[in-house]
Amino acid sequence: MPAKTPELEMMDEDRLIEEVLDKFVNCHEQTYEEFLRTFTHLSKDNVTKREAFGTNSSENNFTSIKFTQRNEPNDCRLSNKAIFLHTSSQCSEEEQIMIGDGQKAGSSFQGDLNRAGKVKVDNFLDIEDLDLDEEINPQLSKDVLLLPGQVEQEVSLSVPSYIPSVAIQPVTPGTKPRPTVKAADKQSKEIVGDEVQPFSLDEEFDYDAVVLTPKFTPAEMNAIKELSKQKTKSADLEDPHD
């Protein structure tokens, strides 16, 4: 058989490449409908049929298990576990049992599988379990009934946040005594209600004769005066004299 030359091999490769390119260029253009057909669309009926088929196949798999050596303890435990799984898979389809007071449900560890996997569990709270008078009513009376920005009026006597401090000056002959403010008598009375009350001045109080609390102490005032005197002296020395 004659051996192929390198030129023939190159020609064969070129032909193969041309054939592949021709198939690719001349192939049928896929439409959008054909593109959608490549996907699998599941309906509700298909899902329910698959679930039913899955449960039947799982039941058949559990029933097809055969144990040849039943006398050994390990095999007995395995059979109990298989039966427990079989009953738990059917508990969603069968009726669930409501356990009353004094009754118990079986477990796979004790070997009693009569009610295993069929017990109905109550995960909801009944209205009877809640004490409406103690829990709900105080919350409604304290939180819900209050208006926005309103405060509970539990304290009858309210202390004002600011009480003006008035210095008592000794009375000298020839000067008019200045009125003093008593904290207990002049406390503002709290007006209960949401209505806006008009503002009015106290006619008995002399607002012009109020003695204000000094900002600086006498020692600080003396120090400030000394500093001002020194500044004036230094300013006079720096200025040229005519």
Curated annotation (Swiss-Prot):
Keywords: Phosphoprotein. GO terms for molecular function: intraciliary transport particle A binding. GO terms for cellular component: 9+0 non-motile cilium; cytosol. GO terms for biological process: acrosome reaction; spermatogenesis. It comes from the Eukaryota. The modification Phosphoserine is found at S57. Interacts with IFT122; the interaction associates IFTAP with IFT-A complex. Seems to play a role in ciliary BBSome localization, maybe through interaction with IFT-A complex. This is Intraflagellar transport-associated protein. It comes from Bos taurus (Bovine).
